[in-house]
Amino acid sequence: MASRQPEVPALEASAPLGKMSLPIGIYRRAVSYDDTLEDPAPMTPPPSDMGSVPWKPVIPERKYQHLAKVEEGEASLPSPAMTLSSAIDSVDKVPVVKAKATHVIMNSLITKQTQESIQHFERQAGLRDAGYTPHKGLTTEETKYLRVAEALHKLKLQSGEVTKEERQPASAQSTPSTTPHSSPKQRPRGWFTSGSSTALPGPNPSTMDSGSGDKDRNLSDKWSLFGPRSLQKYDSGSFATQAYRGAQKPSPLELIRAQANRMAEDPAALKPPKMDIPVMEGKKQPPRAHNLKPRDLNVLTPTGF
């Protein structure tokens, strides 16, 4: 490294080599270590006056510093003789600002990609035909994406699972509906079978049983705001047909009562049938004696004999 000698000779050359002297007026040429590494010439030993040379850390010009200065609007390039403190400050400032910006950009990109994938899936699954009202935790950008729960709720409303007020007049229709969800609502029955029909709105309260009392009368008055339904009567012989009110399932109490009546009428009908197991009768056969002949002993005899 003869070419790397100091350009100005040392003023205090009498200083010992072991001590680091601080000579006045010595300016060492700033050496970039990146250039040294890229130099194809072989490395030579250091100069002999090593102790008289004041070594300073050389900070190479980095690309990200240049980019940061351009982004901030500084057109001037950083000089090679940049001080250590300014370089450390710029190194500390730049990654923090760039990391924050990268964090925000990546978050927005991930959110957008997730929403697009959800939208694509819902479009494929056929769930895009229902409206969606967001709660206050969602942003305005996320409100346009539809959700599965709202579509299911809309399907339930279409299939007939309506509220109680809408279900009550639908129970008095003359023909049963095709969907099982909109069938007439099951009503609690009273103790008497004739009292269950009085809960329906009808023009003839004289058929009410005395056991139902004023409760059923109040019920018929309550639901009379939907309009009293007149029963259609036809002259078809000696009986009149009433409108079909829907199949009424028997209550568990009536099932228990009917089963008790059946047991009282015919107790043998509910007993389990007897199984006729044939018993093997006869004498026990004595164990048969072995009929071994002398030629069979060859099979039973071990080979060692």
Swiss-Prot record:
Question: Which ranges belong to the motif Flavin-containing monooxygenase motif?
Answer: 67-77
Which residue stretches does the UniProt record annotate as biased composition, category Polar residues?
193-210
- Signal sequence range: none
Q: Which GO terms describe its molecular function?
A: oxidoreductase activity
* Primary subcellular site in the record, as a coarse category: cytoplasm
**Enzyme nomenclature, EC number:** 1.-.-.-
Tissue expression pattern: Down-regulated in the occipital lobe of an early stage Alzheimer disease patients.
Q: Which residues carry this modification: Phosphoserine?
A: 182-183
Tell me the compartments it is located in: Cytoplasm
Region Disordered: which residues? 37-56, 158-236, 259-305
| Listed InterPro entries | P33MONOX
Sum up the protein's function in the record's words.
Potential NADPH-dependent oxidoreductase. May be involved in the regulation of neuronal survival, differentiation and axonal outgrowth.
Q: Which family does it belong to?
A: Belongs to the P33MONOX family.
Under the subunit heading, UniProt states: Interacts with NELFB, NOL12 and PRNP.
Instruction: State the name under which the record lists this protein.
Output: Putative monooxygenase p33MONOX
Give me the gene this protein comes from. KIAA1191
